[in-house]
A protein has these predicted regions:
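N-terminal, charge-rich interaction modules
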Residues: 2-49
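Flexible, charged surface loops at secondary-structure boundaries
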Residues: 28, 66-70, 115-118
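Short beta-strand segments
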Residues: 35, 77, 123-127
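Compact, glycine-rich, soluble single-domain proteins
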Residues: 41-66
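Short acidic active-site motifs
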Residues: 61-62, 108-112
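Mid-chain, well-packed structural core segment of small domains
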Residues: 66-102
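A short glycine-rich beta-strand->turn/loop micro-motif centered on a GG-aromatic cluster
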Residues: 100-110
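Short basic, glycine-rich beta-strand/loop surfaces that mediate nucleic-acid
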Residues: 110-128
Length: 128
């Protein structure tokens, strides 16, 4: 299911626990990506899993899927225990796009996302 947001409407990530994240009073029981528009979509983990056998390494293919022109910040919630990280190719991709990457455990990344006024995209891993 895709949640849409009205232009200029503030989004709030209320919290996370192992296996879920709550955004604007809706709980998602899977990893999510929050687009520049505020649209919440399911993360396409298979784009990374096909290369690394795990979704804990973000591939260049997944980076290309997630990135949108105009994005200033890519905030990654790396899981409850911080297991997700970028592949070297994904790091290079975001650097070439001029997009600052902030990677923190999901509970901390939520606070960063909520406080940021940048044009941002979020990816939140909800398990380990």
């Amino acid at each position: 299911m895709i949640a849409l947001r009205l232009e200029g409407q503030a989004m709030e990530i209320e919290g996370t626990k192992f296996g879920s994240i709550t955004i604007d009073r809706k709980t998602y029981e899977h990893d999510v990506v929050i687009r520049l528009s505020g649209e919440v979509i399911k993360r396409k983990k298979k784009l990374s899993k096909k290369y690394y056998g795990t979704s804990h390494v973000l591939s260049k293919d997944e980076a290309k899927f997630v990135f949108e022109k105009g994005c200033e910040q890519f905030i990654i919630g790396s899981g409850q225990m911080g297991n997700v990280h970028l592949s070297p190719e994904a790091e290079t991709y975001f650097a070439k796009k001029g997009c600052k990457v902030l990677l923190q455990p999901t509970p901390d990344a939520i606070g960063v996302f909520n406080k940021s006024h940048a044009k941002k995209i979020g990816l939140f891993h909800v398990t380990c």
